[in-house]
Amino acid sequence: VTGVQTCALPISEVGMKITRAANEQLTFKHPTNPDWRHFSFTQIAKPIFYEDGVAISHNAVAIQPGKIDRSPTGTGCSARLALLHAKGELKLGDRMIGRSIIGSHFDCKIEEELDLNGTKAIRPSIAGQAWITGTYEHRLDPTDPYPLGYKLSDTWPNKL
């Protein structure tokens, strides 16, 4: 993809700075998951434009520890749909094509309008293409006393 090799690093660096600043300065309350209180990534996006009545969103998503996702990300596309819906720019049934920095894309649609504990929300659908990048085999030792793993609740990042 032309130009990506020369612009990804600054986008990643700015994205990580924005994510850190958001986590330091902003708060939010998720309507159904009270334990989710951090910003995970930053989506840097061009203004929406339309082709044949379909919204087109070009973005780059900077993820920890400072990489650019190869996809437009389902979370990012869902958030963009919700934001555009809240601003009145998209309505129930409207479609959006989310395109990543390398041109991969998701076909997104607002399927339903919801109320989640008093917060207006949407239920999006996201469709795209996936490729097998590897296969893995997981085995359990029959003598392992913790075959299902373990969790120490006081060691998760939001508790430190």
Where is each model-derived feature located?
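Active-site beta-strand/loop microenvironment that shapes enzyme catalytic pockets
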Residues: 54-93
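Conserved phosphate/ATP/ADP-binding segment of small-molecule kinases
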Residues: 10-33
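Structural signal for terminal/edge beta-strands and the immediately following C-terminal loop/tail
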Residues: 129-160
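Conserved active-site and cofactor/substrate-binding residues in soluble primary-metabolism enzymes
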Residues: 10-13, 17, 37, 75-79, ...
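Conserved phosphate-donor
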Residues: 25-62, 67
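Short helix/loop capping segments that flank catalytic or ligand/cofactor-binding pockets
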Residues: 4, 81, 134-137
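Short, small-residue-biased leader/transition segments that mark boundaries at the very start
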Residues: 2-9
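A structural-propensity feature for long, helix-poor, extended segments
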Residues: 92-134
